Every structure is written in structure tokens, then in C-alpha cells.
Amino acid sequence: MNHFKIIVPLYNVQDWVKKCVKSIQLQTYSNYECYLVDDISTDSSREIIKSLIQDDERFVLIENTEKKFALRNIYEAIEHSGDNPEDVIVTLDGDDWFATKKALEILNEVYLENRCFMTYGSYIEFPSMKRGPFCKQIPHDVVKGSTYRQSKWFSSHLRTFKRHLWERIEVSDLKNGDEFFRMTWDMAFMFPMLEMSGPLAIHIDKMLYSYNRQNPLNDDKVNHRLQLLTERHIREKNKYEQDFVIADILGPSGNLSGIGNQLFCVATALGYAYEHSATPIFPQIRTDRFINMFKDTFYKNLNVGREGDFSTAFHQEPFFEFQKIKHTRGALKIRGYFQSYKYFENHRNKILDSLNIHELKNGIKEKYGDYSDFVSIHVRRGDYLHLSQYHYNLQMDYYNNAIEHFGKDSKFLIFSNDIDWCKQEFNSLKNVQFSENKDDWEDIILMSTCRDNVIANSSFSWWGAWLNTNNSKTVIAPSRWFGPAYSNKSIKDLIPEDWITNV
């Protein structure tokens, strides 16, 4: 659920402000606050507003004592509204109104689905009731080249953005000298935010906004020449440079559907992003069914953004060998297996936060109990039995040696895609349990809550061990990972140095 902060600058709007306020109060989505900023109106705007919001705690009326104009009013209202970086700011002029009572509901769905930074959209003009001329999606080549300031103006009402994006704008870029721009305020903050958002700026085609053409105080009517001069000045401001890394989670073959393989690519993109202050984007979370199934668990906190290839550079990883990814300005697309902790180990805590691990662990413990004194054992059979040319089938000697390492009286929790076979092979253990009938993400997280881990030659249990945050954990991993077809592949970059491979 998103929390919206609706900012409404207004001046002498007595003929329309009731329609504006009512359109907010009638929203079907109620998780919002509204800040109305009256810029010393000389008509009855304030009195009308006070009568409408007197019993509604979600509304705040800010009454200026000096003339500040719209952009400064928006800036100060946002500063006044709190400091949660995930709040969604919505700008609505006091002489305009929401075109539908489901506007916030639709916005909430868009932000949840796309994990975007900002939205722009479509509006209907009043009183003609015609679609506005700027209701268009920004062209792909403009987004890719970040040439917003050199292009036609597209990003129109309804404009919304995450607060963390707003906080990255330099105040000087909202000003002409010492004063905030008095006109064309939308361009002043939209250009920087579009440049910083790239594919994370989403166009909404549905009509959410009613733009009032009747107001004689509209900028283009009051001083069209000053409006054009201000627009030129804003376009000449310095461009905001932002790097992006776009992950092709499905890998070189296009079928890395397993969660273990996915996580290597995701973590690598996150590691690159943290290393170079880039913005990571994962559009396949929305479009691919094998990735989408984890959108509410591991990928809950990740950016999705627009579809399409917006990359200006491409990095293809060599199979199973660590190769540092060169920093690239602009948008970099990465594709590969990336099966090495070296891509992201330096940012471990941030990776854990990004993958929602702490919340997931708490949920698993609450659902299945506390296994913090157990040793997890993962046995990979199933598909490996038919692909032994590529994947080595671990023998029971490996598991017996691992059990001896911990002692047979230890508590063991066994995970496998062939539990029936495991129940026969491990039936001599005194304290053993088997994980059954769980989702893949649940098994990985449950492994990570165990005290120690015995993994298979599988990215699935590799992640169960890596996500284990027990500082004194022991992880036992096989020294042989591949079958004869891949005998030339090394795992030197795959297994962390403190894991044991010689049992």
C-alpha cells in the first residue's frame, strides 16, 4: 500500500476549488494526506476550503502571508509533509480536479506493479472534454538517450513521484537566480526527475486528471512570453546524469528459470548498482512467469520499470568465471550466469535488505518454527539424474562425511526434490526432519535459518547457505560441481573461502 501526499497550490480559485477538494475526498483509496497551499487569495477560496475540510484530518491548509507562486509553494509543502522517501507525491492544481474517484487506486496499482520512481499521464480538458494534446508516452529513443530537454514536451498530468526522487533535485535547478521559477514549474522538476528515472518513469494512459482551460489566470493566458522564456531557461539547465543497470535475469540461454540462477543475476546487478551508484532495473519481474512468481518475496523491493531495451551498453559474462564488470556511463544491460559471490560480496548487508531477507525469515520462523539449532542438508536429484553429463551426481559418501563432521547426534533438516529417496537413505539418523510441500522460496529461506548448511552442487542450496546470517555458521560444499561435459569449468570463484570443500 502506497501512502500519497497530495500537494495542491492555489490562488483565487473560488469557482473551482470545491470541485478540486471533493474529487480528493471522494477517492476510493483513502491512504493519503492533502496539503492545500493558498497563495494569499483575494477571493473566498480559503473560506470555501475551510468549510470543506473542517472535519477531515487528512487535509492541511497552509495559508501564506506572502506571495510565493506555485513552484515554491509545492517545494515548501513537500518539505512540510514529512520525510518518508517512499511516499508518493501527487501534484494537483487548485483549479483542476481528479477525473475519476479511482485515480489514487489506479496510481497505487501502477506503483505496486511497476515499482517505478514516477508517473505521468493523460488528462481531459475542461470544458471541451477532449483528450489533452500532451497525453503521450515519451518515445523510446528519448528515454534511451535521456534527451528530454531537447525533445517535445510529453510528460503531463497527472504527475506523481517518489519523495526520494524529489530529494535528489538541487534547489538551484528550481530557481532563476535567487527566486523560484514563477511559471512552467512542472518542467522545472520533471526534467531532472525524468533524467534520474529513465525506464522507471511510467506513462498512464487512463484519464486521471481534469485540466481546467477556463481559468483566466493560467500561465499561457497571463504572460505567454514569460512562459516561453522560462521554459527555455529550464531546458538550458544542466542535465542530471544517472547510470542504470538492467538485468537480463533469464541469462544467455533465455531459460534460467530456477530461483537460484535468478538470484545470482539479480544480486550481481544490485552489487554493480551499489558499487557505482547506479539504479538497478528488473523489467522481467513483470513479464516472465518464472520470475514473476517471486515478485512478492525476494523481489518485493526491486524496481521493475518500463519494458523495452533502454541499454546503451551491454555486458556478456563468460561462463562461470568471475570478470569484474566495467563501469559504464548511461544504461548497461548485463546477461550471464554470474555464479560468483565476488560480484556482490562487498555489499552483503544491502543485498540482504534489497532481497527482503529479514522480513522473509521472520515470516518463515513464524510459520514453520525455529530451526536455528539444525543443520540443513540439500540433496539434488530429479533432473540431475538425467543430465549427469553436465551435473555431477553427488554420492552418499559426501553426505555421510558431512554428517560425521557435525556428529550424528546433531539435528538435521533435509531438503530435496526426491524426499522419498532421502527418507530411505537417511533413516539411520536419530534427529532428522524433512522439508516437504513448500514453495521454493520457502525452502531457501528455511535453509538460511539453520545453524549450519550442507549444500549440493546446486545454486538453490548455495543461496540457502549464503543467505544464512549466522556469523559462526559452517557451510560444507562439494568440491566437484560438474559432469564430464563441463570438466574444464572451475568453481574457484563460486565457493566462498570460508566454506569447507574437503570433507
Ranges and model annotations:
Residues 1-242:
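Nucleotide-sugar donor-binding/catalytic module of glycosyltransferases
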Residues 49-52, 290-301, 422-429, 487-492:
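Short, aromatic/basic amphipathic alpha-helical patches
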Residues 67, 95-97, 124-126, 166, ...:
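Short, solvent-exposed loop/turn segments at secondary-structure junctions
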Residues 253-264:
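A short, glycine/small-residue-rich beta-strand->loop->alpha-helix junction that serves as a flexible
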Residues 259, 406-490:
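Donor-binding and catalytic core of enzymes assembling or modifying cell-surface/extracellular glycoconjugates
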Residues 264-273:
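Histidine-anchored nucleotide/phosphate-binding helix
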Residues 285-408:
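Secretory-pathway luminal glycosyltransferase catalytic domains
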Residues 483-503:
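Leloir-type glycosyltransferase catalytic cores
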